[in-house]
């Protein structure tokens, strides 16, 4: 959901500044793409509209009240049928002031899985973005422990790929089932 202070990195990639429009357009896009056998990824869950900084370069922190987050930003993602969702590298301080959503078991379990009822594959955003403050290996481990099913790595650096490959488990039955649909 776009806001007045939404960082320009999201601006024109969001559907609207109204949660109902975002939600309905999201449902429609997921339905039509799926009907045509095209996979969808909803992002950046649980919401990126209140982030004023670009998570490619720094760690955004959202300090909004839970009621507003739940009724606007998070609500846009509720009950979505997409087979994939991508996490936000954003700290939501009202829920977990120490971790980005990607590294937060609280955000992933309580918000994304329970409140928003997302039951499919959760992908980290690019694991090399500057919003994540640990080493590559630690970012991978923290993302998986928090509840991400897959790790996204975008820069093509083979040495980084080896670090990631050496720190991720073999694909489990949940991932196999979801990617076979």
Segments and roles (model prediction):
Residues 11-18:
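Second-shell loop/turn segments in exported
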Residues 2-9:
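Short, conserved phosphate-binding/catalytic loop or strand-edge motifs used
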Residues 21-34, 39-174:
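Second-shell residues forming the walls of enzyme active-site clefts
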Residues 177-181:
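A short, charged, Gly/Pro-tolerant segment at domain boundaries
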